[in-house]
Amino acid sequence: MAHFAKLGKGNIVTKVVVVHNNIATDEAAGIQFLKDLYNEPYSVWVQTSYNTRGGVHKTGGTPFRMNYAGVDYKYDDVRDAFIPPKPFDSWTLNEDTLLWNPPVSFPDDGNRYNWNETNQTWDLVSE
């Protein structure tokens, strides 16, 4: 199955849909199918890879456009990549993965945490 992201103003993803590989034999065919399906000849669609995150293809294939697109992601046409929305003001974009990094690394002790933007800390989630 092929996945496509519909872009709105500012190249922000507004929708992600799946198209069967028999229809989307390549990116151009998938885009034309979606324009016809939605009767939106001027809409902008970009293919995205379900298996790509942080520039790594999780099944060992070739990474495609750095990250699988989601609603509110931005398509950067210079990088030819999808960038997720910035989760917090203090986080910075990792130029190698195009994912957002917190100013303090996530604890690796197996517990669940939430980011506390005010204190710039990871707060343990109590259950």
For every predicted segment, state its role:
Residues 1-127:
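Interaction-interface detector
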